[in-house]
């Protein structure tokens, strides 16, 4: 293996390492979103179970206000791009559950890509080690 080939392979392995790290970060972010979505579903399900529920409304910077929510109230859902819609409890749950399914698909896809890249990275490292070992044996015999 020439020095140029070794450098090229090393560069490719570094790119794969970066990609694997990026996929790991995406996985972590998606897991966080999944937890938040599950908490939202749980909270929406709990609204109105006992008639009127007391909740904390976030005001920003870790500041909250107590409020009461009745079972008949609409739930406001952010649908992206700064837009929000009002939905009844069942429609809100349906929307949240569909979003969870989308997140699960994205998480599976990201995980599969990370695993494939990690396997390619390990294979590439082993191949590089093997080639470097063969190169050192051939050069030590020429001394």
From Swiss-Prot:
The keyword Iron-sulfur does not apply. Keywords: Chaperone, Cytoplasm. One of its GO terms (biological process) is protein folding. It is found in: Cytoplasm. It comes from the Archaea. One of its GO terms (molecular function) is unfolded protein binding. Its main location: cytoplasm. GO terms for cellular component: cytoplasm; prefoldin complex. Molecular chaperone capable of stabilizing a range of proteins. Seems to fulfill an ATP-independent, HSP70-like function in archaeal de novo protein folding. NCBIfam families: prefoldin subunit alpha. Belongs to the prefoldin alpha subunit family. Heterohexamer of two alpha and four beta subunits. This is Prefoldin subunit alpha. It comes from Cenarchaeum symbiosum (strain A). The gene is pfdA.
């Amino acid at each position: 293996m020439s020095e140029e080939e070794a450098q090229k392979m090393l560069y490719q392995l570094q790119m794969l390492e970066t990609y694997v790290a990026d996929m790991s970060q995406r996985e972590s972010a998606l897991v966080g979103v999944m937890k938040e979505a599950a908490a939202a579903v749980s909270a929406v399900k709990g609204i109105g179970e006992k008639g009127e529920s007391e909740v904390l409304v976030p005001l920003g910077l870790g500041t909250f206000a107590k409020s009461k929510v009745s079972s008949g109230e609409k739930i406001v859902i952010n649908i992206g791009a700064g837009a929000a819609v009002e939905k009844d409890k069942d429609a809100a749950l349906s929307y949240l559950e569909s979003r969870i399914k989308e997140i699960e698909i994205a998480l599976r896809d990201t995980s599969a890509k990370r695993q494939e890249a990690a396997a390619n990275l390990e294979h590439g490292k082993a191949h590089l080690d093997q080639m470097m070992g063969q190169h050192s044996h051939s050069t030590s015999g020429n001394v």
